[in-house]
Amino acid sequence: MNKMKRIDFENGSVTGNILGATLPMLVAQILNLLYNIVDRVYIARIPKVGTTALGAVGLCFPIIVIITAFSNLFGSGGAPLFSIYRGKKQENTAVQIMDTSFSMLCICGVFLMLIGFLFARPILVVFGASSNALTYAYPYIMIYLIGTLPSMISIGMNPFINAQGYSTIGMLSVAIGAVANLLLDPLFIFVLGFGVQGAAIATILSQTLSAAFVLFFLTRKSELRVRLLRKNEVPQCTGYAKDIVSLGSAGFIMQLTNSLVTICCNNVLSVTGGNIYISVMTIISSIRQLVETPLHAINEGASPILSYNYGACRPKHVRKAGAILSVMVLVYTAVTWSMIILIPEFLIRIFSSDTVLLKDAVIALKQYFAAFIFMDLQYIGQTVFKSLNKKKFAIFFSLLRKVFIVVPLTYLMPYALHMGTKGVFLAEPVSNVIGGSICFVTMLCTVLPELKKMEK
């Protein structure tokens, strides 16, 4: 397997490398989306209780996002450093970084699972769950928590497969779990009659299969192989751990703040619009995941190319990779935004056929995505900052848009400006324009001068 076709970061063209990494990544991200989307589609179609159950499971999303955020803290934090040191030809250091990421990920996975078991019910109540919603949300999340460690391994270690150029293997690791989930969901939900709990069972079994494949490849077949740190290695890897957490904090904060925004939105919507609007928000969040999936693929595909060439001191390659990244992201978003505005009913019906829900969701969806194209600027800036190890900028802009703009607006617009539910959905486009523009301009003003100096 070491002789299989890989992306040649050293000699391949920048455009070819980005496309070679992005296309398998796109397939992987689309398949990965099935883990959550398929659950929601099937749950929404459970007879009599589908809409209620969908809203209840939506209350679990912040917990799931938190688990994913910790996975990416170590995976997305470690993989760019891993690529930078590979670019510098310091492979022993690269392996130590990968081992450190893996060890921290495993410890964190067990810890999060135990915390979840102890506090899941009060957490769901804080997130806005009514006694009726808890009937569906609590069993779902308790089962999901059993698969915390496999979920974190499959998500957190996959970037190290892609960072070694095995983009097809990275895609396959996701495909295994996604296809299994697609097959197991109807079996456990409808055939065996487990309902919402069946969706959770199908998900954790699928994630376990994916994690097993990732571990098999990274421990047996990849060029640089992973293992847990030995006790005597821990002191010398403390510095790497700090760097990993520091760099991974940007993506970690973005995902945690996504949960924070979801919690705030659900709390305000429960007061201003009731349970029906929590279901609307669940559908909008699902559509956002759907349309953002290719964006994540493009960003994650370009990231190792940016990191490797930055580590190898090739400023022209870094600049070209950034330009290609920007064009791909902008073109994709222009097409997607047009679809959202022109055919919102089609996208909403993927998740629910409830006519009452559809009427409210169409209006809310258009409001929420009104300035979605400005979100590109945030994605491009964040990807460049993370890939080039610009920790402070990456962390700052992760906080700026969500914590300092969206959250205050989520309360200010519905209450102080008396906009009701409309204010909740319009807080997003306002933050996209402000936060995205500032992030992109800052990236241009800081990174381009550094690359010019590197050329000299």
How should these model regions be labeled?
Residues M1-T22, F82-G147, V191-G248, L306-A371, ...:
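Short alpha-helical transmembrane segments in multi-pass integral membrane proteins
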Residues F9-V49, P62-G77, L81, C106-M113, ...:
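N-terminal transmembrane alpha-helices
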Residues G20-D39, I143, G177, S206-S210, ...:
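Transmembrane helical elements of multi-pass membrane transporters/channels
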Residues A28, N32, N36-I43, T68-G75, ...:
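Alpha-helical transmembrane segments and their lipid-water interface positions
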Residues I30, L34-G55, L124-S131, L187-F194, ...:
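Helix-terminus/linker motif at the lipid-water interface of multi-pass membrane proteins
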Residues L54-L114, S151-G170, N266, I278-S338, ...:
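Small-residue-rich hydrophobic transmembrane alpha-helices
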Residues N72-G75, Y144-N162, G170-N181, A199-V214, ...:
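Short runs within selected transmembrane alpha-helices of multi-pass transporters and secretion channels
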